[in-house]
A protein has these predicted regions:
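Non-catalytic pre-domain segments flanking phosphatase-related domains
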Residues: 1-16
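Short beta-strand/loop segments at the ligand-binding rim of alpha/beta enzyme cores
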Residues: 53-58, 97-105, 122-124
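Substrate-recognition element of Asp-dependent hydrolases with the DxDx(T/V) motif
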Residues: 47-71, 81-82, 118
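Conserved Lys-Pro-Asp/Glu-containing loop-to-beta segment of HAD-superfamily phosphomonoesterases
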Residues: 88-115
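Short, well-ordered beta-strand core segments
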Residues: 14, 57, 80, 124-126
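A positional/architectural concept
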Residues: 22-52, 62
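Acidic, Mg2+-coordinating phosphoryl-transfer loop and its flanking beta/alpha structural elements
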Residues: 106-134
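Short, acidic/turn-prone active-site loops that include or flank metal/cofactor-
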Residues: 83-88, 129-132
Length: 134
Protein backbone atom coordinates (compact mmCIF):
# COMPACT_ATOMS: atom_id res chain seq x y z
CA UNK A 1 0.00 0.00 0.00
CA UNK A 2 1.43 3.36 -1.04
CA UNK A 3 -0.19 6.70 -1.69
CA UNK A 4 -3.93 6.47 -0.96
CA UNK A 5 -4.94 8.64 -3.94
CA UNK A 6 -2.93 6.43 -6.28
CA UNK A 7 -4.22 3.23 -4.67
CA UNK A 8 -7.86 4.29 -4.88
CA UNK A 9 -7.50 5.45 -8.50
CA UNK A 10 -6.75 1.84 -9.55
CA UNK A 11 -9.89 0.41 -7.93
CA UNK A 12 -12.25 -1.60 -10.13
CA UNK A 13 -14.09 -3.60 -7.47
CA UNK A 14 -15.47 -3.36 -3.96
CA UNK A 15 -15.79 -6.45 -1.77
CA UNK A 16 -17.71 -6.29 1.49
CA UNK A 17 -18.47 -8.31 4.56
CA UNK A 18 -22.03 -7.65 5.81
CA UNK A 19 -22.47 -7.83 9.58
CA UNK A 20 -20.74 -4.85 11.15
CA UNK A 21 -20.12 -3.25 7.75
CA UNK A 22 -23.61 -2.70 6.33
CA UNK A 23 -25.24 -3.19 9.73
CA UNK A 24 -24.72 -2.08 13.30
CA UNK A 25 -23.79 -5.68 14.12
CA UNK A 26 -27.10 -6.47 15.78
CA UNK A 27 -28.92 -9.61 14.65
CA UNK A 28 -32.42 -10.59 15.74
CA UNK A 29 -33.41 -14.25 15.22
CA UNK A 30 -36.81 -15.08 13.75
CA UNK A 31 -38.85 -18.20 14.60
CA UNK A 32 -38.21 -19.63 11.10
CA UNK A 33 -34.44 -19.61 11.70
CA UNK A 34 -33.73 -16.53 9.59
CA UNK A 35 -32.31 -13.33 11.07
CA UNK A 36 -33.29 -9.68 10.83
CA UNK A 37 -30.47 -7.21 10.34
CA UNK A 38 -30.78 -3.44 10.47
CA UNK A 39 -29.21 -1.80 7.41
CA UNK A 40 -28.30 1.83 6.76
CA UNK A 41 -30.29 3.02 3.71
CA UNK A 42 -27.50 5.22 2.31
CA UNK A 43 -25.23 2.19 1.99
CA UNK A 44 -27.75 0.69 -0.41
CA UNK A 45 -27.55 3.68 -2.70
CA UNK A 46 -23.76 3.47 -2.69
CA UNK A 47 -23.99 -0.09 -4.05
CA UNK A 48 -26.34 1.01 -6.83
CA UNK A 49 -24.12 3.99 -7.67
CA UNK A 50 -20.92 1.91 -7.73
CA UNK A 51 -22.61 -0.58 -10.05
CA UNK A 52 -23.77 2.24 -12.36
CA UNK A 53 -20.25 3.64 -12.47
CA UNK A 54 -18.95 0.29 -13.72
CA UNK A 55 -17.43 -1.07 -10.51
CA UNK A 56 -17.81 -4.73 -9.58
CA UNK A 57 -19.43 -5.28 -6.17
CA UNK A 58 -19.06 -8.54 -4.28
CA UNK A 59 -20.48 -9.58 -0.93
CA UNK A 60 -18.64 -12.28 1.04
CA UNK A 61 -20.24 -13.03 4.39
CA UNK A 62 -20.33 -15.77 6.96
CA UNK A 63 -23.97 -14.89 7.61
CA UNK A 64 -26.75 -16.55 5.75
CA UNK A 65 -30.48 -16.30 5.32
CA UNK A 66 -33.17 -15.66 2.76
CA UNK A 67 -33.63 -12.02 3.80
CA UNK A 68 -29.90 -11.38 3.50
CA UNK A 69 -29.72 -12.96 0.06
CA UNK A 70 -32.78 -11.10 -1.23
CA UNK A 71 -31.41 -7.75 -0.07
CA UNK A 72 -28.22 -8.00 -2.09
CA UNK A 73 -29.81 -9.69 -5.10
CA UNK A 74 -32.20 -6.72 -5.24
CA UNK A 75 -29.21 -4.41 -5.63
CA UNK A 76 -27.76 -6.64 -8.36
CA UNK A 77 -24.32 -7.11 -6.85
CA UNK A 78 -21.83 -8.80 -9.15
CA UNK A 79 -21.45 -11.75 -6.78
CA UNK A 80 -23.08 -12.73 -3.48
CA UNK A 81 -21.50 -15.41 -1.30
CA UNK A 82 -23.16 -16.22 2.01
CA UNK A 83 -22.45 -18.85 4.65
CA UNK A 84 -18.76 -18.46 3.77
CA UNK A 85 -16.22 -20.17 6.03
CA UNK A 86 -13.18 -19.43 3.84
CA UNK A 87 -13.37 -15.79 2.75
CA UNK A 88 -9.87 -15.59 1.31
CA UNK A 89 -10.53 -18.46 -1.12
CA UNK A 90 -13.78 -16.83 -2.26
CA UNK A 91 -12.07 -13.45 -2.64
CA UNK A 92 -9.32 -14.98 -4.77
CA UNK A 93 -11.90 -16.83 -6.89
CA UNK A 94 -13.85 -13.60 -7.43
CA UNK A 95 -10.70 -11.70 -8.45
CA UNK A 96 -9.63 -14.49 -10.83
CA UNK A 97 -13.09 -14.80 -12.40
CA UNK A 98 -13.33 -11.04 -12.93
CA UNK A 99 -9.72 -10.63 -14.10
CA UNK A 100 -8.83 -8.36 -11.19
CA UNK A 101 -5.41 -7.74 -9.73
CA UNK A 102 -5.49 -7.46 -5.90
CA UNK A 103 -4.31 -3.83 -6.23
CA UNK A 104 -7.62 -3.06 -7.99
CA UNK A 105 -9.79 -4.22 -5.09
CA UNK A 106 -11.15 -2.56 -1.95
CA UNK A 107 -12.13 -4.93 0.85
CA UNK A 108 -14.17 -3.65 3.77
CA UNK A 109 -14.40 -5.83 6.85
CA UNK A 110 -14.81 -5.29 10.54
CA UNK A 111 -13.61 -8.38 12.38
CA UNK A 112 -10.90 -11.03 12.64
CA UNK A 113 -12.38 -13.33 9.92
CA UNK A 114 -11.82 -10.45 7.47
CA UNK A 115 -8.11 -9.92 8.15
CA UNK A 116 -6.75 -12.31 5.48
CA UNK A 117 -8.87 -10.60 2.83
CA UNK A 118 -7.79 -7.18 4.01
CA UNK A 119 -4.14 -8.20 3.70
CA UNK A 120 -4.75 -9.54 0.17
CA UNK A 121 -6.14 -6.40 -1.49
CA UNK A 122 -4.71 -3.05 -2.50
CA UNK A 123 -7.12 -0.97 -0.43
CA UNK A 124 -8.24 -2.52 2.87
CA UNK A 125 -10.77 -0.44 4.83
CA UNK A 126 -12.82 -0.85 7.99
CA UNK A 127 -15.65 0.96 9.76
CA UNK A 128 -14.62 3.12 12.72
CA UNK A 129 -16.04 0.62 15.21
CA UNK A 130 -14.22 -2.43 13.79
CA UNK A 131 -12.51 -4.90 16.11
CA UNK A 132 -9.23 -3.44 17.36
CA UNK A 133 -7.26 -6.18 15.57
CA UNK A 134 -8.55 -4.87 12.26
Amino acid sequence: MGNFKEDIARVKAFVFDVDGVFTDGGIMPLPNGDFVRKYYAKDSYAIVYAHRMGFKVCIITGGRGELLRRRFEYYKVTRFIDGCTDKITELRRFMADEGLDPSEVVFMGDDIPDLDCMREVGVPVAPADAAWEV
